[in-house]
Amino acid sequence: MHPQGRAAPPQLLLGLFLVLLLLLQLSAPISASENPKVKQKALIRQREVVDLYNGMCLQGPAGVPGRDGSPGANGIPGTPGIPGRDGFKGEKGECLRESFEESWTPNYKQCSWSSLNYGIDLGKIAECTFTKMRSNSALRVLFSGSLRLKCRNACCQRWYFTFNGAECSGPLPIEAIIYLDQGSPELNSTINIHRTSSVEGLCEGIGAGLVDVAIWVGTCSDYPKGDASTGWNSVSRIIIEELPK
């Protein structure tokens, strides 16, 4: 089965029909018996047809599709849309607190003694006054020096810090102890040893301003005192430092 061709356009068919009609009129013989007026009208009609359709071009086949044109200019902005619906409620977040504080400036002090050689068993040994800059800070204190305790029977001695006359309560006292037992009968319990030791700790809850920091010697609870000595033949020092919390 042969494929059918594409149908001719109506304009092409009409033009072919008119040309065919013109050719038939031109080729038809004119009878001698015809009236001259009729012959003249026929010639006039033929000229009119020739004038009307002279130069008429038949429609050719369709051309190749043209290329895409250049993109058009952007259109005007559209009108805003209607507001959307509210979203779902989010989860509860964490609360963050930011503290904007001035930069921390180191604040410390040292008091030292070349040879305290303090032989008391009860009382204040040395004191150092410090200026505390902030109320919400802590004080770090250190005493370094030689300590000694001797006795013939069991004894105990305690060295501790005070702040403006009171021991630290934030959180607990700052102290060090030496306990000496009488030992066995064959040992000499009166041996005299001086050893460099330290008493150190942090204390919180002290207000800003002048603070009298002192090192003391006293007794241990439920034990008798002995023969104490502090700072013999060596340098002793108290170091105080203010620290941020």
Swiss-Prot record:
GO molecular function, one term: frizzled binding
Signal sequence annotation: 1-32
GO cellular component: collagen trimer; extracellular matrix; extracellular space; sarcoplasm
Region Disordered, residue ranges: 64-87
Sugar-modified residues: 188
Highest taxon of source: Eukaryota
Posttranslational modification: N-glycosylated.
Keyword line: Collagen, Extracellular matrix, Glycoprotein, Secreted, Signal
GO BP terms, alphabetized: cell migration; cochlea morphogenesis; establishment of planar polarity involved in neural tube closure; inner ear receptor cell stereocilium organization; negative regulation of canonical Wnt signaling pathway; ossification involved in bone remodeling; osteoblast differentiation; osteoblast proliferation
Domain Collagen-like: 59-92
Localization (cell): Secreted, Extracellular space, Extracellular matrix
Function: May act as a negative regulator of collagen matrix deposition.
Designated name of the protein: Collagen triple helix repeat-containing protein 1
Organism this protein belongs to: Mus musculus
Gene, per the UniProt record: Cthrc1
